[in-house]
Amino acid sequence: MFEARLVQGSILKKVLEALKDLINEACWDISSSGVNLQSMDSSHVSLVQLTLRSEGFDTYRCDRNLAMGVNLTSMSKILKCAGNEDIITLRAEDNADTLALVFEAPNQEKVSDYEMKLMDLDVEQLGIPEQEYSCVVKMPSGEFARICRDLSHIGDAVVISCAKDGVKFSASGELGNGNIKLSQTSNVDKEEEAVTIEMNEPVQLTFALRYLNFFTKATPLSSTVTLSMSADVPLVVEYKIADMGHLKYYLAPKIEDEEGS
């Protein structure tokens, strides 16, 4: 049997908000080490990888590995019934075709119990190679979300240019163009407000803003976001989930000759 209890249930609510608009259904791989999810988005352009380590839960039990096919829209609807302060418990029997979700109010005066039907999903796991990146930018997640949102009003794609002194986001469209440059911050009291750049070589890559705006739905999970870039490989947008794991999005760069399309 599988049972996982999360006192800070709002984390699970935020994870589903970050996934549901990008992926309709996905397989949750449950093992003794934790919960993993890996899925291409519905249009097979981007890839999502979620890790929630078992030690991040308040109690965690998994007797044998499970692969649970979940409709994320359905799960999100059920999690909307949980209060932000609620304690959430997930429970499934070893060969169950349902997942139980239990929401307990902190004062223990209210307990809600839901059961969600699971799906049979045929999922292929893609190997994600570990690699070194030419440029790694860490910045406030709210700032990144705002830049993506603002530049979406200008064009469909953003050019991210990374150099030692700063990172530049540029977009152009019928109304003109826009550029936003963030300089590396040297002395910031709060780490979550810093912009740091680790660069081996400069990069300049173009990405579809539509997908970046989907990724930034994960902003409530973390005060910072990390962008890892190299020429000709997918961008990695990573949100750390405190003491639990991470949510990573992968997006291939647009090829220059696609620009006009």
UniProtKB/Swiss-Prot annotation:
Gene3D superfamilies: 3.70.10.10. The keyword Glycoprotein does not apply. Residues 61-80 bind DNA. InterPro entries: DNA_clamp_sf, Pr_cel_nuc_antig, Pr_cel_nuc_antig_C, Pr_cel_nuc_antig_CS, Pr_cel_nuc_antig_N. There is a cross-link at K164, K254 (Glycyl lysine isopeptide (Lys-Gly) (interchain with G-Cter in SUMO2)). It is found in: Nucleus. CDD domains: PCNA. Its main location: nucleus. Signal peptide: none annotated. GO terms for cellular component: centrosome; chromatin; chromosome, telomeric region; cyclin-dependent protein kinase holoenzyme complex; extracellular exosome; male germ cell nucleus; nuclear body; nuclear lamina. PROSITE patterns: PCNA_1, PCNA_2. Phosphorylated. Phosphorylation at Tyr-211 by EGFR stabilizes chromatin-associated PCNA. The modification N6-acetyllysine is found at K14, K77, K80, K248. One of its GO terms (biological process) is epithelial cell differentiation. Homotrimer. Interacts with p300/EP300; the interaction occurs on chromatin in UV-irradiated damaged cells. Interacts with CREBBP (via transactivation domain and C-terminus); the interaction occurs on chromatin in UV-irradiated damaged cells. Directly interacts with POLD1, POLD3 and POLD4 subunits of the DNA polymerase delta complex, POLD3 being the major interacting partner; the interaction with POLD3 is inhibited by CDKN1A/p21(CIP1). Forms a complex with activator 1 heteropentamer in the presence of ATP. Interacts with EXO1, POLH, POLK, DNMT1, ERCC5, FEN1, CDC6 and POLDIP2. Belongs to the PCNA family. This is Proliferating cell nuclear antigen.
